Design a protein with these regions (language model features):
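Acidic, low-complexity central loop/insert segments
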Residues: 17-20, 25-28, 71-188
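Hydrophobic side chains in well-ordered alpha-helices
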Residues: 37-38, 92-95, 239
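Short amphipathic alpha-helix segments
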Residues: 58, 122-140, 248-263
Length: 318
């Protein structure tokens, strides 16, 4: 049987193809103030984002808690697309629209106007080669955004987001289930926020400062002071880790350590079954101290979670 740290050749082969992304949606910001408006709302620089390129960003409350995470794609000088979890789209659109005031920008739900597909393995590599995460290639109105790769037994499996108008032909390749895509997302160590963990984390608790999701040099945005203070004062005590579990986990589920059985020390962010049937892998955000004491699902006596190597290095506290 494969150990959690060593994935099987069959799983490598499974991560090659095209997946529908029915759980993601699109918000469109259009107008001459679109970039300036979003720059003042999100954790990353939008003003300096070139047309045809993308960035990861967080949309936070005044207390710095993430209300959504977004893949920001600039398709024209006055048009920006925000790809996010569909279960957060309506409330995110409503809150962003509340801040528009006199800005010359219109925020709309554009999910029905765009096709979203996840590309894995050769399908992603053909379009993007060895491009760094968030690099974007435009092809006659369609966009391929390089995502963080899945890492299986020290082998990187390319991942990409394909975004195109509804009239465009779909990308060719073997059809993959959304469950396989979700597992590949877990194994990349980078995920988009979903409703079960709404306002559960500041961006650094999902490692966003280490994967291009936070710009500490940009101006103010909701929650900016909390996010910056956590980084500059070295007060980060929670991070996201990659784990293997013998049992199924659900986003928002509490995780405990026997050293403190009465209080949850971590939260499940995203979980998916391994394609070979050998258990589950998950992203869990928890205290650095508790990671070393052992995590258990649901209760301190629950199934033990095995820490796996994170696929990327964490940015040291500034």
């Amino acid at each position: 049987m494969n150990t959690p740290a060593n994935t099987s050749p069959a799983q490598h082969l499974a991560l090659n193809g095209v997946s529908a992304l029915p759980h993601w949606g699109v918000i469109q910001a259009q107008g001459e103030d679109a970039a300036d408006f979003l720059h003042k709302q999100l954790s990353n620089d939008v003003l300096l984002l070139p047309v045809g390129q993308s960035r990861l960003a967080a949309f936070c409350s005044a207390k710095g808690r993430m209300q959504a995470s977004l893949i920001v794609v600039k398709t024209a000088p006055d048009t920006i697309l925000l790809v996010l979890s569909l279960d957060l789209l309506a409330q995110t659109l409503k809150r962003l629209s509340m801040f528009v005031l006199r800005a010359k920008v219109k925020m709309t739900d554009a999910t029905g106007q765009w096709q979203l597909r996840g590309l894995l393995g050769d399908r992603a590599k053909v379009l993007l080669g060895d491009a760094a995460p968030w690099h974007t290639v435009e092809m006659a109105g369609a966009y391929a955004v390089a995502l963080y790769p899945s890492v299986l037994s020290n082998v990187q499996v390319p991942r990409a987001l394909w975004l195109a108008p509804i009239s465009k032909a779909l990308p060719e390749g073997p059809e993959l289930s959304s469950e396989v895509w979700q597992w590949a997302e877990v194994m990349s160590g980078v995920t988009l926020l979903t409703q079960p963990v709404f306002e559960a984390f500041v961006p650094q608790m999902l490692n966003y400062e280490s994967v291009g999701g936070v710009n500490f040099k940009k101006g103010c945005y909701p929650g900016q002071e909390v996010v910056a203070r956590s980084q500059f004062r070295g007060t980060l005590k929670r991070r996201t880790a990659l784990v293997h579990s013998p049992v199924s986990l659900t986003p928002g589920q509490d995780v405990f350590t026997p050293a403190d059985p009465e209080q949850a020390c971590a939260t499940v962010v995203l979980s998916a079954a391994r394609p070979d049937g050998q258990g589950f892998d998950a992203l869990v955000s928890g205290t650095l101290e508790s990671m070393q004491k052992g995590w258990h699902a649901g209760t301190a006596e629950g199934a033990a979670l095995e820490l796996l190597p994170l696929p990327y290095p964490l940015l040291a506290d500034i």
